[in-house]
Amino acid sequence: MRFSQFYAPTLKEAPADAEVPSQELLTRAGFIRKIAAGVYTYLPLGRRVLLKIEKIVREEMDNIGANEILMPIIQPAELWKQSGRWEDYGPEMMKLKDRHGRDFTLGPTHEELVTFLVQNELNSYKQLPITLYQMANKYRDEIRPRFGVLRAREFIMKDGYSFHSDWESLDETYKAHRKAYSNIMERIGLKYAVVEASSGAIGGNESHEFVAFADTGESNVLFCECGYAGNDERVPYTGEIIYDNEELKGMEKVYTPNVKTAQDVADFLGVPVRKIVKTLIYKGRNGYFMALVPGDRELNEEKLKNFLNDQSLAFATPDDILKDFGVPIGFLGPVGVKGIKVIADHLVKGMKNFVVGGMEKDYHFVNVNVDRDFKVDELADLIVTREGDPCPVCGKPLNAKKGIELGHIFKLGTKYSEAMGSKYMDKDGQLKPFIMGCYGWGVSRTLGAIVEQLHDEKGIIWPLSVAPFAVVITPVSNNENLMKFSEELYNFLVEKGEEVLLDDRNISPGMKFNDADLIGIPFRVTVGKALSEGMVEIKWRTGQQFKVKATLEEIYEFLQKSKQEYDPHKRVEK
């Protein structure tokens, strides 16, 4: 491809709304353009990378015998109502009506639709197991789309679904996907971890995430030297419950003006923040729930949703709380509240003489105690497990790293097949619900994750496996000899099957070099004054520089050797 014919509009300045490196660099380097919040056009460079990611994913799916299909984006509401997720999925689901007033959704995922498909196609155990997958656009109305393609409202996803007649078969397919997804990470060239995860709104009884490490990631991976790893939404807290050794004091209501957080309350009252019990109100299918956690810990919403078996659970709005409880959100507490289920973290059980909201603006209760002053309906593990907490396997302190979730696999069991009446006939002639697995991979998110992990101050550093071009040939001027050799080299490398960009633009060499670094092409061949000495300069995007004899064969051979040694994670400073 000649740069003069290629649409790659690079920018000198970062977009004002860029929050993370991938959003800035993919925009500046001409890979994407923002159309609306969370909605992007992929320009030719971006599309080339996406196609390579898709190719790797497709090859790994082919290797495990999965079958590619393509399902519609628009899905009828009836299917989601059958599974119970029309309401459970929450406000992230994009809903619409057709001209006849019928409800539809722009599919955020396709469990319901694929289950409906197979119930009309598969009717015997002899047709099982089978795995179907697609790569298609998905839609989720994120409350705050952010981080460019990492958290978008429209995104490209590979979603796969397997159907089985027994759990052993599901186990085999689950393991095959786990290996295939690890292969995808390794073939792309990302540093990653496979972690235990929460199943969330998808459901199921076993789940793993494939997380690419990145400082800007929204996933918090906890791992231990024993080999255990889990998403902090999933990792149980197994620390010791500390029982306060003190006499019970009389409860009092005290004036606490202008305090908003647990730390504010602790500072105002002169007590440790762990002596504060935070009260959080959630609203679900069955009304309100009150959750209590120590002031020095955070509530884990996924744990609460799983404990209550209600994925529709959402944090109550300040307006709802003021309307239904008559108190501002910062002064809620369990004392004197009736008609609401109270669930406390296990750590609250050991606390004595703690502080809670006074159910009146600018007031808190001090010296509060469970059982004497209010009742807890149920105890549960509700807190976010964090770095330094004990490993649930060996008890040693956990370490933490940030990451970006790219893949997620689930053992769904019979959740969807039972809800939708999807059954097959077993060998005894009995109708049984399909046992299912689900396997997702964020294709467009992978584009952003690579850049988050592999970039420097000059731009992107693409791994060879997904780079839009492997080589850029850069003549430093339009001098006849330089251009003639550059054209010959370009044609020779193209004939050899190389993906080459010839920068034939009539601009300064500095601008060409800057664009090559910004775009992130692994190898740059500079055709300049060294040609008069029979040499060209080759620079790797990772910084290494070489002089190579200016013959077509020697340049080609050097590039082949460079491909074997090039590692985008090993950069040199110049």
UniProtKB/Swiss-Prot annotation:
Catalytic activity: tRNA(Pro) + L-proline + ATP = L-prolyl-tRNA(Pro) + AMP + diphosphate
CDD domains xrefs: ProRS-INS (cd04334), ProRS_anticodon_short (cd00861), ProRS_core_prok (cd00779)
tRNA processing keyword on record: no
PROSITE patterns: AA_TRNA_LIGASE_II (PS50862)
Places the protein is found: Cytoplasm
Presence of the UniProt keyword Magnesium in the record: no
Gene Ontology cellular component list: cytosol
Subunit comment: Homodimer.
Record's protein name: Proline--tRNA ligase
Species assigned in the record: Fervidobacterium nodosum (strain ATCC 35602 / DSM 5306 / Rt17-B1)
Gene from which the chain derives: proS
